[in-house]
């Protein structure tokens, strides 16, 4: 599956948006990928995650388990794990850091692929990887549907992405004038508290 194939899935779902967005990282961007509109259709999610699973195996080999960060990584993590024929578990934020809960755990030395939806700065990926390593897992790779950094982000392990884009993202104090002139939308989820 090519970058264009992945973007076609986002376009078909109405999930490739243009405007002025505050991402969950806190950065501002003229492009937002509304992944939930993609993942709400099982057939679309299946196509993307099957291709991601194939790329994981071709790149780093077969993992023993897939671990994802809640909430955004749960659906692609589960579907990718299905195609890898491994268990899918996730970590949740507790006290500001990711922890294994709900009876989820790793066996020491298990080969783990960390599966995300979209990576921009890699913060959630690095935090999830740290939780996996703390629990005794061996992280053989991180994987995502879309890498918005164009391959520049460093998560500390190989990053396998189905689609790599170089999408501009800016701190609030360094916005280009054309982006600053557009009203802000804040679709990110990291700051939401239930």
From Swiss-Prot:
Pathway noted in the entry: Pyrimidine metabolism; UMP biosynthesis via de novo pathway; UMP from orotate: step 1/2
Family annotation (PROSITE patterns): PUR_PYR_PR_TRANSFER (PS00103)
Gene for this chain: pyrE
Family: Belongs to the purine/pyrimidine phosphoribosyltransferase family. PyrE subfamily.
Taxonomic lineage: Bacteria, Pseudomonadati, Pseudomonadota, Alphaproteobacteria, Caulobacterales
Cofactor(s) required, per the database record: Mg(2+)
Source taxon at top rank: Bacteria
Protein name (database record): Orotate phosphoribosyltransferase
Binding site for 5-phospho-alpha-D-ribose 1-diphosphate: 116-124
GO terms of molecular function: magnesium ion binding; orotate phosphoribosyltransferase activity
UniProt catalytic activity: orotidine 5'-phosphate + diphosphate = orotate + 5-phospho-alpha-D-ribose 1-diphosphate
Binding-site residues for orotate, renumbered to this chain: 120, 148
Transmembrane regions listed in the UniProt entry: none
Subunit note: Homodimer.
CDD domains: PRTases_typeI
EC number in record: 2.4.2.10
